[in-house]
Design a protein with these regions (language model features):
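Sec-dependent N-terminal signal peptides
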Residues: 4-15
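Short, low-complexity N-terminal intrinsically disordered segments enriched in polar/charged residues
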Residues: 14-40
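Exposed beta-sheet edge and beta->alpha loop/turn motif
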Residues: 85-133
C-alpha cells in the first residue's frame, strides 16, 4: 500500500510538471507570435493574441498598434527575446521576458497571461525595469 501511494505521488508530480511545461511552451509561443507580428507591422495578427479585456479597451488593431509603438517600442522592434521565469502573481500567470531592443538596451517585461476558450492570451504587459546596459 505504501508503495502504491508513493507511485501515485510520483505520477501526480510528473504529470503536473509536464502540464506546467506545456503551459510554459504555449505561453511563450503566444508571446513570440505576437512579437513576430509586431516586427512586420502586422497589428491585425498581433491583436489576435490580446485578451478580450485588452481588445475591449483598444477597440481595434490600429489603436492597439499605436499604443505599442508609443508605449512599448522595445516590443515593437526587438533584437533578442529571452524567456525568464513563469510566475504566479496574485493568482495570475506572469511570464517574465528580457528583451534587447534595436538600440541594444535591455528591458525586463512582465506578460500577464489569461487562459481563454481560444487558448492563452496576453492580458497586459508591464515594464519591470527600464533599460539595463
Amino acid at each position: 500500500m505504501k508503495n502504491l501511494i508513493v507511485f501515485i505521488s510520483i505520477l501526480f508530480f510528473y504529470s503536473t510538471v509536464i502540464a506546467e511545461t506545456n503551459d510554459d511552451q504555449k505561453i511563450q509561443g503566444v508571446i513570440s507570435q505576437q512579437i513576430s507580428s509586431f516586427q512586420v507591422d502586422d497589428f491585425d495578427k498581433a491583436f489576435t493574441f490580446a485578451s478580450p479585456s485588452i481588445k475591449k479597451i483598444f477597440g481595434n488593431s490600429n489603436n492597439f498598434g499605436k499604443m505599442v509603438r508609443r508605449g512599448f517600442p522595445m516590443v515593437w522592434r526587438t533584437k533578442v527575446v529571452d524567456y525568464l521565469k513563469l510566475l504566479i502573481v496574485d493568482g495570475a500567470l506572469v511570464q517574465r521576458v528580457m528583451i534587447t531592443d534595436i538600440n541594444d538596451e535591455i528591458f525586463i517585461l512582465n506578460y500577464i497571461m489569461v487562459e481563454t476558450t481560444k487558448g492563452w492570451k496576453i492580458r497586459g504587459v508591464t515594464i519591470d525595469q527600464r533599460p539595463l546596459t
